[in-house]
């Protein structure tokens, strides 16, 4: 965690960072490197649907197929099927190793034990007990009966920003 904590602040000539900004550019870079191994499956959590939409669009622009669990039951089941089984609603094979979920409404009740990596895009700005509960619920989508792979959890924070202040407040009290 500490190693990943200041990723957004590192000086870099990476064109992704120039185009998308530090956090989103670095997230795309990390996801790309993880997907070199086709067995890796990634869950991205955010508190805001707009952020997840932006991430999804940016990943797609960079050739990374992804799904966003939102909408009606059919849309949600379609996104889950693509991620878990690599099959769309018409039975076609698809390559979709990234799924995005809102921490507000999509984390509970969803089983995603195929995941190998989880990203929290920003710290949760709530009281500590609530943050712990929300994170445990989110991680529990992948870390449950049926999980056979090692699961890595990463938090993306930008150094010297309100994000770092929130993270420090939650982890020092």
Predicted segments — roles?
Residues 55-57, 110-114, 136-137, 167-168:
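Short amphipathic alpha-helical segments
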Residues 49-50, 73, 105-107, 117, ...:
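Conserved beta-strand elements of beta-rich interaction domains across eukaryotes
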Residues 127-173:
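A conserved SF2-helicase RecA2
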Residues 30-33, 58, 82, 117, ...:
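Alpha-helical recognition domains of nuclear gene-regulatory proteins
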Residues 110-123, 150-156:
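A short beta-strand element within the Helicase C-terminal
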Residues 100-101, 120:
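Acidic beta-strand-to-loop metal/phosphate-binding motif
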Residues 1-98, 104-106, 110:
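Conserved Helicase C-terminal RecA-like lobe
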Residues 62-65, 85-89, 118-121, 141-144, ...:
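Short, low-complexity, polar/charged sequence segments that are solvent-exposed and flexible
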């Amino acid at each position: 965690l500490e190693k990943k904590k200041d990723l957004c602040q590192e000086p870099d000539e990476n064109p992704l960072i120039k185009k998308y900004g530090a956090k989103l550019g670095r997230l795309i870079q990390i996801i790309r490197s993880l997907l070199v191994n086709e067995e890796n499956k990634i869950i991205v959590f955010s508190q805001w649907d707009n952020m997840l939409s932006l991430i999804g669009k940016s990943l797609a622009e960079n050739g990374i197929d992804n799904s966003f669990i939102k909408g009606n039951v059919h849309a949600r089941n379609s996104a889950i099927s693509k991620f878990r089984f690599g099959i769309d609603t018409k039975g076609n094979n698809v390559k979709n190793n990234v799924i995005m979920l809102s921490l507000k409404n999509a984390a509970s009740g969803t089983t995603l034990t195929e995941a190998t990596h989880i990203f929290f895009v920003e710290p949760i700005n709530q009281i500590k007990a609530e943050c712990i509960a929300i994170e445990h619920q989110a991680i529990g989508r992948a870390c449950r009966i049926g999980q056979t792979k090692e699961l890595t959890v990463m938090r993306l924070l930008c150094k010297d920003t309100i994000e770092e202040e929130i993270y420090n407040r939650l982890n020092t009290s």
